[in-house]
Swiss-Prot record:
Keywords attached to this entry: Cytoplasm, Exonuclease, Hydrolase, Nuclease
Role: Bidirectionally degrades single-stranded DNA into large acid-insoluble oligonucleotides, which are then degraded further into small acid-soluble oligonucleotides.
Gene name of the encoded protein: xseB
Chief location category: cytoplasm
Family: Belongs to the XseB family.
Native organism: Geobacillus thermodenitrificans (strain NG80-2)
Protein name (record): Exodeoxyribonuclease 7 small subunit
């Protein structure tokens, strides 16, 4: 059986923002703060990886002949 459906970027950001809010309150027990921090780091990496993937996709545009070419902002 496959693992849970992969979290979207938006879902990960929302969860990360929630963790940051909890940690900023300052009344979180140390053990919970460490667990929140670890989860936040995982979510941060997930978001970073998704952004890198999108960035790589945007580096290329499809020509009329179907050939992928690097995107140049000057051509836009």
């Amino acid at each position: 059986m496959s693992e849970e459906k992969e979290m979207t970027f938006e879902e990960a950001m929302k969860q990360l923002e929630s963790i940051v809010e909890k940690l900023e309150e300052g009344n979180v027990p140390l053990e919970d703060a460490i667990a929140f921090f670890q989860e936040g780091m995982k979510l941060s990496k997930l978001c970073h990886d998704k952004l890198q993937h999108v960035e790589k996709q945007l580096e290329y545009m499809l020509r009329e002949d179907g050939e992928l070419v690097p995107f140049s902002p000057e051509e836009a």
